[in-house]
Amino acid sequence: FAVRNANGTGPYQLVSREQDVKTVLKAFDGYWGKGKYPLGITELVYLTIKSDATRVAALLSGEVDFVQDTPVQDIQRLEAAPGMRVAVGPENRAIFFGMNIGSPELASSDVKGKNPFADKRVRNALVAAIDREAIKRAVMRGQAVPAGMIAPPFVNGYDKALDTPPKADPEAAKKLLAEAGYPNGFSVTLNCPNDRYINDEAICQASVSMFAKIGINVKLSAGPKGPHFNLIQKEPPETDFFLLGWGVPTYDSHYIFSFLHQTRGGKDGTWNATRYSNKDLDAKIVSLTSETDLAKRNATIADIWKTVQSDAIYIPIHNQTLAFAMKADLDIITHPDNQVFMKMFGGKK
């Protein structure tokens, strides 16, 4: 492709740009794909509007025609507004909790001399404590798909059987904690971003209440995504319990395994703040990069998923959904990667 289509021959040309204010693009007559794509939009004006309320107000007032990041609390209102429509679709992003399961002791816990998260019964107790349907209903306003694994359905290696969302069972969770030696629970700090994922801090707040019901006293520490991600990526990581979201641009499970499950070191496991390490699993993950027999490769992927699911390394919550709001005479569809492909738009309905 790149041999015959030089950089700078895309569907739109840059006209002007004011950083964090406005970017203006116009259709490029020399686009190599002209005639192959509708190209109904001849000029694009991107406005940066950080406030959810201001963004929605701009759409309703006619200042803008389209809003990409529609707040879940405003979807119903926009759907009911005259002259408006909302397109909803699945996003390529799983939301989940991670735990420090590899350190001898949790820095933020009142348990000293051992690590509660190192016991799989404790991890399974936390899995059972989460009421995913309640989060979907009350926090996400229905705009989420409860999950049992941290891979969206369109990723190679996805297993519907493994993705069955665990039912909330506080009593079973309490029993698991007691069996693990924590009948009265324990305390730990949960690190959460407040500006990265849809209602991220609200998800954490709801989960803190759910963990409290089984006796785990979780102190919530929420902050901007930059410092939050630094806690996860530092060496060693500086978090015992954290919220994270993960998209899969390759649409293949190897992308998940190599960043989140592989033993951390060098370029491997760079987002694996769980301290999980399984050398046999590492070898299988590495083999995926060279295996040319697709049947064998997919069998290895399935085997890896069974192992990491059994080990309960992460606590899946849900997959995000996307909502694009626009004037009713526009028809712009959602894409799992949350990209707006304006060249695919043929014009007004």
Question: What is the role of each PLM region?
Answer:
Residues 11, 128, 145-179, 196-200:
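Structural transition elements
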Residues 7, 46-57, 69-73, 195, ...:
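Short helix-initiation/N-cap motifs at beta->coil->alpha
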Residues 90-106, 113, 227-289, 336, ...:
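Acidic-aromatic pocket-rim loops
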